[in-house]
Regions:
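Short coil/turn linking the two alpha-helices of tandem helical-hairpin repeats
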Residues: 3-13, 48-57, 94, 114, ...
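Short coil turns that delineate tetratricopeptide repeat
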Residues: 33, 75-77, 111
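OB-fold (S1/OB) nucleic-acid-binding surfaces
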Residues: 187, 195-226
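Short nucleic-acid-contacting surface segments enriched for D/E, G, S/T with interspersed K/R
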Residues: 226-242
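OB-fold/S1-family single-stranded nucleic acid-binding modules
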Residues: 242-294
């Protein structure tokens, strides 16, 4: 996929190159629908498109579908690149167990390639940190935690205060609920509100992750995507999240048991921080780190 690998300094040119790359990859697949290498290239092209052009879930589904087709080919199925890049996509989808297994598959296919092992270990560390920080409520001392919870003030709901939010001609009802009341998936017309108790470091810096506690001292992780460089939250900030998307991670891997809940936020512009809705200047695209192993 030479076209996608050309260095460009202009974002528009890079987008155009990726679009052309997708079209060429689709053409290659159409010439031989059993060629796993072509399917792998198409999957990589869709992955680049998802991160660079528009983070449309449909594009990511096309990416995963292409990888699934590639795995039907014995030759492509033995390629560690396929499973490494698949793991990258799975990590972004927060399908962590599958991501870990895909990194491991890349490791098994090429034991001399260190990057999959490094990324697998980094993801494991991140997940352990998430689990530990949620369990310890950000390692916050009881007195400090009590003070922070007491400082939660509904005036910091900003435009979400009052049970509804209006943008243009559209109005959405928003009921303030506790974190424990959330259910997996999108919580339509619900609103959660809490204090930031810690950050969670990730080697890839994507997503920007932190923990919040609500009035009942329930602690939960929040993962924010598309956050501009240098932006974020500070411990003690009040954060309101409308219609939160909840995921519940429950799995075991390599002697680690994970059981935690987190809220996924696709764009920071929906957040209200200390009473103020974040602006477009807080948003940035995700930079994709995919790999092609050099022989």
């Amino acid at each position: 996929m030479v076209l996608r690998q050309e260095p460009t300094t202009i974002h528009e040119l890079r987008v155009e190159n990726i679009q052309h790359g997708v079209e060429f990859a689709k053409e290659a697949v159409s010439l031989d629908t059993t060629d796993g290498t072509s399917w792998t290239i198409l999957g990589n092209a869709y992955l680049s498109s998802f991160f660079t052009i528009a983070q449309n879930p449909a594009t990511l589904r096309l990416c995963m579908s292409a990888y699934a087709q590639a795995e039907k080919d014995v030759v492509a199925k033995s390629n560690p690149d396929l499973f490494f890049n698949k793991a990258t996509a799975l990590k972004y989808q927060e399908e962590y167990k599958s991501a870990l297994e895909s990194f491991e598959r890349a490791m098994l296919l090429d034991p001399t390639w260190e990057i999959p092992r490094t990324k697998r270990d980094e993801l494991l560390k991140y997940l352990r940190d998430v689990q530990n920080l949620i369990n310890s409520k950000g390692r916050m001392k009881p007195k400090r935690l009590y003070q922070m919870v007491q400082a939660l003030d509904e005036k910091h709901l900003g435009p979400y205060k009052g049970g509804s939010y209006t943008s243009g001609e559209k109005s959405v009802k928003l009921q303030l609920v506790q974190l424990k009341d959330l259910t997996p998936g999108v919580n339509v017309e619900k609103l959660v509100f809490g204090k930031v108790v810690c950050w969670i470091q990730d080697s890839d810096c994507v997503p920007f992750a932190f923990c919040i506690v609500d009035q009942e001292k329930t602690c939960m992780a929040v993962t924010v995507y598309n956050l501009a460089k240098g932006r974020g939250v500070t411990v003690g900030d009040s954060v309101a999240i409308p219609e939160p998307y909840l995921t519940h991670q429950t799995f075991a891997y390599a002697g680690n048991d994970f059981d935690f809940k987190s809220i996924r936020v696709e764009t920071p512009v929906i957040l209200v921080l200390n009473g103020r809705k974040l602006g477009r200047d807080q948003q940035a695209g995700v930079k994709l780190c995919s790999y092609k192993k050099t022989d």
